[in-house]
Amino acid sequence: MLIDDTPTTFTSPRDSIDTGIATVHQTLAIVDELSVWRNFFLGQELTGRFGALRDTEMKQICAEQLREMGIDIPDVDVDAGNLSGGQRQVVAIARAVYFGARVLILDEPTAALGVKQSGVVLRFVAAARDRGIAVVLVTHNPHHAYLVGDHFTILKLGRQELDEPRENVTLDELTHQMAGGGELEALSHELGR
């Protein structure tokens, strides 16, 4: 793998994180019983003398970062369990961006979300992309991919089936390839349809 044109090998997940690669997994590392700001800083809390938490500063930073990315969570003191699925995803993504992600790998960020919540997440993905962060969006939804993507790669059983920039692929072609491509055509022929 090349990082800034330099061949790089990672020996642990920490190595990739230190390089600026962040992953937001489908099953979020969000603690429902903690506030939004506590989740935002979880494991990387700002502390003062004698280890005291700098609560006020962390709340302010969290609120500012969410606002800068176009996300409206009026009260960062609210427990994360009270947020919608889309808002929870956005908090996890904003956290990765704030802590220096240059490459953001998102694993099915809209999988269990409705249309409105998916829109919240996709707007945030577009904002991260527009800030110069490389985004790898893993999804089974061609419509979501096409809304925010500028390059598409489709893998089937670990093999690359498609690798094209957006200008070379229509939404219909992307949908067809993601749905099985040639296999669907063979099945259609076999079934006489």
Model-derived features with residue positions:
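Glycine-rich phosphate-binding loops of nucleotide-dependent enzymes
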Residues: 1-193
